[in-house]
């Protein structure tokens, strides 16, 4: 038990533990994003515009499966954090084994479905026929390694639920560098195109999963369940599915909205598709720390809810919002100032239109980043207290507002590419209008403080 007691967030200072928990979480997810970013940069530079469009247009489909998995793990981790905060280790061990078995089964089924249905799904979102062969090859290879994605997310979320965000980072950093090396080898040296990029991603994720499992077996006694890994507790499954499915539905709702937006973008030509792929990668890097600050708040609040420390929950929430604000201001300065340099990473020298479109978008979106910072902080609060339905409904409101805005601006009014940033802002405002009254009500009802 001594291996993880130091990660107990129910006592001591608030700011320093919250920041020290958040930083490895942010770094870990940024390194994870380098998987797809490396695909985009290397494929765009060494294979071409159409290959970059193929990778980008398949990414939202891939993300639906990945975010279903991470959503289930995230929902289960809220329960784990509360059980750990309450020192209920027997229930915690059964929670861990039940989540693992259910997640593995889901991953296998989803992988088989996508191996069979890759082409029809791509046509459903209006991917041009010329891009389908490369996009389908990329998808099939990625889905063959979906079990690795689940196992790493499961093991990492379990450690984070106990307050340990540093250990998953160490494995992920190694895996990220291997992925970049693999991209260079398979794409640049062997010239395997988008298929080589997908192979590099799967291999790196498999290694990350393996290293994480070995470490847990040797270093974290609480998670060495032995035969208990095969315990499937039906009584816990219901609550796990409730929390996990709500969180997963939230993630899928977000990606379905992105798919609809992608289907609109796909009608605007290959250059616009490539620019959209590039700015989405930048947005992913920008949003990830905001999301991770919210996840750190979730772990902090859930552990303290299990321990019954309501005043500490309130202070943790306020501290988390302050961190979100400081980060968003710094983000604006970086994206605004470096937009041209950022876009040249994703396009060949001759793709001036792609670079120009991306710069106009980034200059506009950069000053709006404070809004997702606020929404992620509020969502961290509701996840931490166990009210995941609010996070689901608010995400739906966000994507509904964004999709409507995209259709009006792009399809009806024929506005320029940068108007996608205004659509994002509209979605965030709708989301906050839904969340803030519920937050005030929850505070008044004594959920914390």
Language model segments and positions:
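Small-residue-rich hydrophobic transmembrane alpha-helices
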Residues: 52-112, 149-168, 275-339, 372-386, ...
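Short runs within selected transmembrane alpha-helices of multi-pass transporters and secretion channels
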Residues: 73, 142-160, 168-176, 197-210, ...
């Amino acid at each position: 038990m001594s291996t993880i007691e130091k990660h107990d967030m129910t006592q001591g200072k608030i700011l320093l533990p919250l920041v020290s928990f958040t930083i490895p979480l942010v770094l870990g997810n940024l390194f994870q994003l380098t998987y797809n970013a490396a695909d985009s940069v290397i494929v765009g530079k060494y294979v071409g515009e159409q290959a970059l469009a193929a990778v980008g247009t398949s990414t939202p489909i891939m993300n639906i499966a990945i975010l279903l998995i991470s959503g289930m793990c995230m929902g289960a981790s809220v329960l784990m954090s509360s059980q750990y905060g309450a020192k209920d280790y027997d229930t915690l061990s059964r929670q861990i084994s039940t989540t693992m078995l259910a997640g593995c089964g889901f991953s296998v089924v989803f992988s088989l479905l996508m191996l069979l249905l890759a082409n029809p799904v791509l046509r459903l979102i209006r991917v041009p026929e010329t891009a389908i062969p490369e996009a389908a090859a990329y998808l099939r290879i990625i889905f063959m390694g979906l079990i690795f994605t689940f196992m790493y997310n499961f093991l990492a979320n379990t450690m984070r639920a106990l307050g340990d965000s540093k250990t998953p980072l160490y494995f992920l950093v190694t895996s990220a560098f291997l992925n970049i090396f693999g991209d260079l080898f398979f794409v640049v040296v062997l010239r395997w195109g988008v298929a080589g990029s997908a192979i590099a991603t799967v291999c790196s994720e498999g290694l990350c999963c393996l290293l994480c499992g070995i470490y847990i077996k040797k270093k974290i006694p609480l998670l060495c369940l032995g035969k208990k890994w095969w315990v499937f507790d039906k009584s816990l499954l219901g609550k796990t599915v409730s929390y996990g499915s709500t969180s997963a539905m939230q993630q899928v709702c977000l990606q379905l909205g992105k798919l609809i937006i992608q289907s609109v973008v796909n009608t605007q030509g290959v250059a616009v598709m490539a620019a959209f792929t590039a700015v989405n990668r930048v947005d992913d890097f920008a949003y990830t720390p905001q999301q991770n600050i919210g996840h750190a708040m979730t772990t902090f609040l859930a552990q303290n809810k299990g321990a019954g420390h309501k005043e500490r929950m309130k202070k943790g929430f306020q501290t988390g919002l302050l961190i979100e604000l400081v980060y968003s201001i710094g983000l604006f300065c970086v994206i605004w100032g470096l937009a041209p340099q950022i876009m040249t990473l994703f396009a060949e020298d001759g793709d001036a239109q792609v670079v120009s479109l991306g710069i106009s978008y980034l200059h506009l979106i950069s000053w709006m980043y404070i809004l997702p910072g606020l929404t992620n902080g509020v969502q961290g609060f509701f996840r931490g207290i166990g009210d995941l339905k609010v996070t689901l409904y608010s995400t739906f409101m966000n994507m509904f507002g964004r999709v409507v805005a995209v259709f009006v601006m792009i399809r009806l009014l024929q506005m320029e590419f940068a108007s996608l940033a205004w659509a994002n802002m509209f979605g965030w405002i709708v989301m906050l209008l839904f969340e803030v009254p519920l937050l005030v009500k929850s505070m008044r009802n004594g959920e914390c403080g």
